Amino acid sequence: MEEQHQEAGNESKPSSTSVDLQGDSPLQVEISDAVSERDKVKFTVQTKSGLPHFAQSEFSVVRQHEEFIWLHDTYVENEEYAGLIIPPAPPRPDFEASREKLQKLGEGNSSITREEFSKMKQELEAEYLAIFKKTVAMHEVFLQRLAAHPTLRRDHNFSVFLEYSQDLSVREKNRKEVLGGLLRSIVRSADEVLITGISGLKEVDDFFEHERTFLVEYHTRIRDTCQRADRVMHSHKCLADNYIPISAALSSLGTQEVNQLKRSFLKLAELFERLRKLEGRVASDEDLKLSDMLRYYMRDSQAAKDLLYRRLRALADYENANKALDKARTRNREVRPAESRQQLCCQRFERLSDSAKQELMDFKSRRVSSFRKNLIELAELELKHAKASTLLLQNTLVALKGEP
């Protein structure tokens, strides 16, 4: 397998995570080209803009994965966007598993025939290409979500990411920073339990109480569904891989058999080879249309949960500010600072509540449209493959019965 791989911009990129994100947006973003160099992928990001804060109407830059993560982190850390669902960061490109499989295949090629080796090598190269295309698509969806959002697309760092032609000098997070992020996640989870459990804070809006209950359960269920969908997809892929040796064995046996059986064995060998290709397509389609979609919305639902936590934290701060103001008035000391603090907390809580309600409704609409589109397409593809498999078996049966 080549260590460098390039995807042309006019090739179709798989997209299972969304329906038409860009529409009539004044900011159109796409990844027109990508090059893989061992562990790094360089994405060519092309932008067409009708927004006044860009210097040009069309421009392109080359970005790496770490720069996408930097952009995501700047949104998460910006208080201005606390009331918004921040689109999930794209996953890190990971081609190591495919490379290891190919290396093991090369090391153990003495135990298999040249034909088996060639077919298995083609399968692994196709797997590598599929991972590469999905990597490009996930990075593109992240940018398109930002570009389609009326608030997020006006962010200064987003403009820099899209327009600044030089390298952003963003390095990969070190071990300490990764552990720090994990620690913050643990602290946040503990804080949420403390707010809702020990302190006994009561939700003041039924809409958000319902959304929080729903998202906690939904996130768990979509994670479990994703794991099971992955197992089904891998089963189809394993079946496809297992057709290779049986096809080769039948073909080899056919060359040794008497003429009355030779054609039958060769016909069966051809059947298993064509079934292998069909099973491979089934696995690929289930991975793209189901597993990838579930995996994306597992991350997106986590982003929605993060939004609800920020609002809940704002509610707790507002309640604490009210208590502090009551104490200040009782003691008749530092009343004005307590009033200012209470007003700021109130304003922040109301601002987050207003934007969060719209964001959660948009999340529902986006999720329904995406699932409906992909599940319909998956069912159509499953039917198409089932018909092809049935026709293949029927033709093989006719051929076998017609032999003397």
UniProtKB/Swiss-Prot annotation:
Residues of the region (Disordered) are 1-29
Organism domain of life? Eukaryota
| Keyword vocabulary terms for this entry | Coiled coil, Protein transport, Transport
What GO biological process terms are annotated to this protein in UniProt? Answer: protein transport
Indicate the segments forming the PX domain, all copies. 21-168
The UniProt entry's coiled-coil ranges are 255-336
Protein name according to UniProt: Sorting nexin-32
Q: Name the gene that codes for it.
A: Snx32
